[in-house]
Amino acid sequence: MIQQETRLHVADNTGAKELLAIRVLGGSKRRYAGIGDVIVASVKDAIPGGSVKKGDVVKAVVVRTVKESRRADGSYIKFDENAAVILGSGREPKGTRIFGPVGRELREHKFMKIVSLAPEVI
C-alpha cells in the first residue's frame, strides 16, 4: 500500500533512484495505491546525466509493494521493496529498461510495455 509521503525505489533506467509519493490518482478520496496504480511523485534522488532530475514531479506506476496484495485466486503476492516505474507520455514508460520482477496485475491494468520489458512477471 502506497500513500502520500511514501518513498519508493525506481525500477527503470531514467536516472532517478528514489521517489516520494505526492498523490494517488483515481478519485478525490483515494488513499492507497497498489500494484498497477498510478501516482504523482517527486524525484528525491537521481544520478547525474539522467533523463529526470532531482525535484522533478512525475507520474509513475507502482510495480512492487511490501504490503501483500490478494489476488482473485486467493493467493497473495508481496515483495521486498516498494518500487515504481516512471511514465512518459500516456501510459508508456519513460525508460527503456525495467529492473527486477513486476506484478502480474500490470497486465490487467494495460501496462503491456512494462510487462514486456520486465525480466520477470510474478
Swiss-Prot record:
Biological process terms in GO annotation: translation
A Pfam family matched in the record: Ribosomal_L14
Family under the similarity heading: Belongs to the universal ribosomal protein uL14 family.
Protein name as it appears in the record: Large ribosomal subunit protein uL14
GO terms for cellular component: cytosolic large ribosomal subunit
Function in brief: Binds to 23S rRNA. Forms part of two intersubunit bridges in the 70S ribosome.
Assembly description: Part of the 50S ribosomal subunit. Forms a cluster with proteins L3 and L19. In the 70S ribosome, L14 and L19 interact and together make contacts with the 16S rRNA in bridges B5 and B8.
Molecular function in Gene Ontology: large ribosomal subunit rRNA binding; structural constituent of ribosome
Highest taxon listed in the record's lineage: Bacteria
The organism of origin for this protein: Bifidobacterium longum (strain NCC 2705)
Keyword Chloroplast: no
UniProt-listed NCBIfam families: rplN_bact
Keywords: Ribonucleoprotein, Ribosomal protein, RNA-binding, rRNA-binding
